[in-house]
Amino acid sequence: THRVLTTPVPAPKDLLGKFEPVFEVAALPLQAGNESQVRAQFIERLRSQGQSVPMFGLALKNDSNYYLLTLRESHRPTASASPRDRLDVSLLQQHVIATLCPSQQEQEAMLYSKDDHEALNWVRQGKVTAALLLNPTKVAEVKAVASAGERMPHKSTYFFPKPLTGLVMNVMEG
């Protein structure tokens, strides 16, 4: 589930300067008439390259770029790290959300979207200050976290269709 920020964020140059030690940053410039192609390329690169390395997408209000943030090797979790600590959503929380939203109040003001285009549209329309796109959590990652006896981070999965609660939780007596 993508994170969408409603609180102020630093100017792009300042923000990217904070991320440079931790992330390799690739900018995909937007120009008049090419947004749909650049957006498609942005999402495709996030999905394909993000399968092998921790990678996040970033869109900022009033900025003419999409950014791909690839976690540098030196900041990636080791093989001995817990399954929860190796999740993209945990890495995003540790390296990005903690920087952009240091207070609990700012984190509680965050919105969530399961749809890439919805999150990016909110930014382009000026409704929010930033969108952070993640790759979906894999079922194998959920199983690894559960097998280790850990809990999944908040809003880290989105499975559909969802079972109806009444069919699963309530005892039906005749």
Label every model-predicted segment.
Residues 1-174:
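Surface-exposed, charge/polar-rich loops and edge strands
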